[in-house]
């Protein structure tokens, strides 16, 4: 099976779907002020045609209700600028392209469009037709839009996914050189970490180059993705997954060869690596860069119905929080896990993820490290 066929969130609306388990809204709270500033500066710059039709691409939109959280924030930010101007100019039409891989569950996304349009008219007074939303399926590591056609590109929690598993993780004899690991983790040897960094450098450079061509001069890009910060020792979702798969091997429920042959195309860069790649590629100016961390159980509600939870308030809360974390991790990685290990292993794996999540939460290290970076396309010399 081709890698891109399983590189998507768990679709549908079931208990293990991404739509039911994502805590995306909690992360957007941190991103929203930077998003608003990007939109405001774009509109005030009077770029070509922006006051007639504001063109936006959301790269890696995933599926479910969370897809429209960013769209709503973008629309509200645009309209906020119009209100501040206090003039009679009509608000620009907004054209938004939702992008993800072809296997993304776009059906569940567009089933929500009618209610989104109704809420938009109710909350923002925008008539249907003044905000146009469509799909642009395909890899965001390839061309998606015509040259100099877009004003703003946004991507949230996607760019840590690589275009492919790095080369060099298996010898010519088919022996894994990343034993016991599923990505470039702290336990990986330096050559493995370099292979993942090289692949990220190649992919992120391609991403910047291609999408700089799609943006108009001085167009903006806002990116948020997981990162690693040396001063914090926060195991991320991949670390939880790696620990839990190793537990299954130790307990005899999974063959070691299955673990050693499982390499996930994910890399969490440092902020220094991100800055270096942006500067070396050269198309963008870094306007803003911030790191933050959010708790594993962001979005958790004690009212959520997790089966089998204890009746003791304290242990019940701990069990439910850990179960919530396991559900989120499963909703992200289930397609690629099922493809490699088979679906039968998923319930046991989820149980072990919850156990490991509970340990990390008790240790006070249950946080995801993230980076927000705001970029502006450098103007051509003729535009300066």
Swiss-Prot record:
Annotated binding of theobromine, by residue: 27, 157, 160-161, 237, 368
Chain sites annotated for binding Mg(2+): 178, 260, 262-263
Pfam families per record: Methyltransf_7
Pathway it works in: Alkaloid biosynthesis
Annotated site residues (Involved in substrate discrimination) in this chain: 154, 266, 328, 343
GO process annotations (BP): alkaloid metabolic process; methylation
Record carries keyword Endoplasmic reticulum: no
Similarity comment text for this entry: Belongs to the methyltransferase superfamily. Type-7 methyltransferase family.
Name of the protein this chain belongs to: 3,7-dimethylxanthine N-methyltransferase
Organism the protein comes from: Coffea canephora (Robusta coffee)
Gene coding for it: DXMT
